[in-house]
């Protein structure tokens, strides 16, 4: 999908791409999984070549932050959650050339959607491509900060469940959620660090206007303040994991102790029975017509009763 935006009194407005000359008035060209004809339209009208999928997936710094005859290029991770609430990072290719920002991505992203909503009423200060780029990065950092707050909130709820130590389905779900939160926290950290690298490259290599230079440094300070919070999340998750494993080990030791006591209690009767073999001359049950089926039923009950009891106690 191809979208283009122009400046109208320092505000972004979407261009209707019906006429062939529309792209030349744009300040921001946004492409999501572009078709071949959309790539050709950008190449023909603006003379801009776009990154390919292998180039988007390359993680080497030299392939993610560079400048050539086609402009200034930055490939940066953006955090998202899919329809199944699985977290991930998707690479967005930014290119700035001739005062125009190009963005190429594989999917719709929350930061872009939020920025487009804000841009309807937000006035740009300087109205240049660098300001658009930094505004998108700023929106991304706000989203990551919100995600860190959500993880903190979830960990508080999980902490109460785990520290109570009452194992069951809720406890198992808590451990599963804890592992998921660790994965989300790791992806947030990866996104923060990647954005930090991108901004450092932008500050060093690009000739930013003074307003955008200060904006970039402000975002870097925000990232520096968020990274320790993100690190504390891993410490909290690690503590809860160790606490959960400790409670599980204690519960397992208690169950093993009960099994050991039961085994010891029944060992002497078993020893006596095995020594004598129950070979007595006077055994009334031998002449009882229901002796055999009665013994079968008794054996079944003797095996079923402890099983049901252990199952009720969640020992099995």
Curated annotation (Swiss-Prot):
Subcellular compartments: Cell inner membrane
Superkingdom in the source lineage: Bacteria
Motif (Probable selectivity filter): 277-279
CDD domains in alphabetical order: EcCorA-like_1 (cd12835)
Keywords carried by this UniProt record: Cell inner membrane, Cell membrane, Ion transport, Magnesium, Membrane, Transmembrane, Transmembrane helix, Transport
Residue stretches spanning the membrane: 258-278, 290-310
A GO cellular component entry from the record: plasma membrane
InterPro entries: CorA_cytoplasmic_dom, CorA_MIT, CorA_TM1_TM2, Mg/Co-transport_prot_CorA, MgTranspt_CorA/ZnTranspt_ZntB
Recorded topology in the membrane: Multi-pass membrane protein
Catalyses which reaction(s): Mg(2+)(in) = Mg(2+)(out)
MF-aspect GO terms: cobalt ion transmembrane transporter activity; magnesium ion transmembrane transporter activity; nickel cation transmembrane transporter activity
Pfam families, per database record: CorA
Domain notes: The central ion permeation pathway is formed by the first transmembrane domain from each of the five subunits. Mg(2+) binding strengthens interactions between subunits and leads to the formation of a symmetrical homopentamer surrounding a closed ion permeation pathway. Low Mg(2+) concentrations trigger both a conformation change within each subunit and a loosening of the interactions between subunits. This results in an open ion conduction pathway. In addition, this results in a less symmetrical shape of the whole complex.
Chain's role: Mediates influx of magnesium ions. Alternates between open and closed states. Activated by low cytoplasmic Mg(2+) levels. Inactive when cytoplasmic Mg(2+) levels are high.
Family according to the record: Belongs to the CorA metal ion transporter (MIT) (TC 1.A.35) family.
Protein name as annotated: Magnesium transport protein CorA
């Amino acid at each position: 999908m191809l979208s283009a935006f122009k400046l109208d009194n320092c505000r972004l407005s979407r261009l209707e791409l019906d006429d062939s000359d529309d792209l030349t008035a744009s300040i921001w060209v946004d492409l999501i999984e572009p078709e071949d004809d959309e790539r050709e339209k950008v190449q023909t009208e603006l003379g801009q070549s776009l990154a390919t999928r292998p180039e988007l997936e390359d993680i080497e710094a030299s392939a993610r932050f560079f400048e050539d005859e086609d402009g200034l290029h930055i490939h940066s991770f953006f955090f998202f959650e899919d329809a199944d609430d699985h977290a991930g990072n998707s690479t967005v290719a930014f290119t700035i050339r001739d005062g125009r920002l190009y963005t190429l991505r594989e999917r719709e992203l929350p930061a872009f959607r939020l920025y487009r909503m804000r841009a309807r009423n937000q006035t740009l200060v300087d109205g240049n491509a660098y300001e658009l780029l930094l505004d998108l990065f700023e929106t991304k950092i706000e989203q990551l900060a919100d995600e860190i707050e959500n993880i903190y909130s979830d960990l508080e709820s999980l902490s109460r469940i785990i520290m109570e130590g009452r194992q069951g389905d809720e406890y198992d779900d808590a451990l599963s959620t804890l592992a998921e939160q660790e994965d989300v926290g790791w992806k947030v950290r990866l996104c923060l660090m990647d954005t930090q690298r991108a901004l450092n490259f932008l500050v060093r290599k690009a000739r930013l206007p003074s307003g955008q230079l200060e904006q970039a440094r402000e975002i870097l300070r925000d990232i520096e303040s968020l990274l320790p919070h993100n690190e504390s999340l891993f410490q909290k998750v690690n503590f809860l994991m160790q606490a959960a494993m400790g409670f599980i080990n204690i519960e397992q030791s208690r169950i093993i102790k009960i099994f050991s006591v039961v085994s010891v209690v029944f060992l002497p009767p078993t020893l006596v029975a095995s020594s004598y073999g129950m070979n007595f001359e006077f055994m009334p049950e031998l002449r009882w017509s229901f002796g055999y089926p009665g013994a079968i039923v008794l054996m079944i009950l003797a095996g079923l009763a402890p099983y049901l009891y252990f199952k009720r106690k969640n020992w099995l």
